[in-house]
């Protein structure tokens, strides 16, 4: 169906979010309900619908607005019941946080169809002495550790099987002067990849 607008915000070491606006139809109303999962065609990161708002615009057309969070937010529904004290790589510590709270936490606490990736590349994050806060929110613990090591975390979704995988990865340097040989990613009106821009200067 026709989409009025889609804002799909990916984040590197934290949870992304989306906002979708579509014309009101019976099919859209049936599919776009809270807790349903949405994924872009050809994509591998999904999001859960958490907010629905139906409006009538200035032309008299009804529209459905839905918003939600990427599936990394599922980890935020769990806490660390046992403190993690380890000397290991940040990558393995991130796996341990999710394993303890989401995939090897017992039948009552495991998140269905969620597993930990076994094919992630070694990020070379190096060993650290790590001590988690007891009863910390699992998502907050993972995001804090990932940010400290400059690692990306995400939940990948296989749309065909309905399986979800927690993954840790290292970002690529796409700046104009990068030394890794990566093609730079440049946003410019000259390249017609900036539609709108806005500047705000505030003391509040």
Regions found by a protein language model. Give the residues of each.
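Intrinsically disordered, low-complexity, compositionally biased regions/tails
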Residues: 20, 110, 128-130
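An acidic/polar, Gly/Ser/Thr-rich interaction patch typically located in mid-to-C-terminal regions
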Residues: 2-30, 151-152, 187-204
């Amino acid at each position: 169906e026709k989409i009025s607008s889609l804002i799909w915000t990916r984040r590197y070491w934290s949870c992304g979010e989306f906002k979708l606006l579509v014309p009101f139809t019976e099919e859209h109303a049936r599919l776009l309900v809270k807790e349903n999962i949405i994924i872009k065609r050809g994509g591998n990161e999904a999001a859960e619908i958490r907010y629905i708002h139906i409006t009538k615009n200035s032309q008299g057309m009804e529209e459905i607005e839905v918003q939600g969070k990427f599936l990394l937010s599922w980890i935020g529904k769990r806490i660390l019941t046992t403190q993690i004290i380890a000397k290991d790589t940040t990558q393995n510590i991130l796996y341990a946080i999710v394993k303890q709270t989401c995939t090897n936490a017992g039948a009552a606490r495991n998140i269905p169809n969620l597993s930990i990736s076994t094919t992630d590349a070694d990020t070379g994050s190096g060993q650290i002495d790590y001590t988690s806060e007891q009863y910390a929110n699992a998502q907050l613990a993972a995001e804090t550790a990932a940010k400290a090591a400059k690692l990306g975390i995400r939940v990948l979704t296989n749309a065909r099987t309905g399986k979800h995988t927690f993954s840790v990865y290292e970002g690529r340097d796409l700046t104009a002067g990068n030394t890794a040989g990566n093609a730079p990613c440049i946003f410019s009106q000259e390249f017609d990849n900036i539609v709108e821009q806005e500047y705000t200067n505030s003391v509040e």
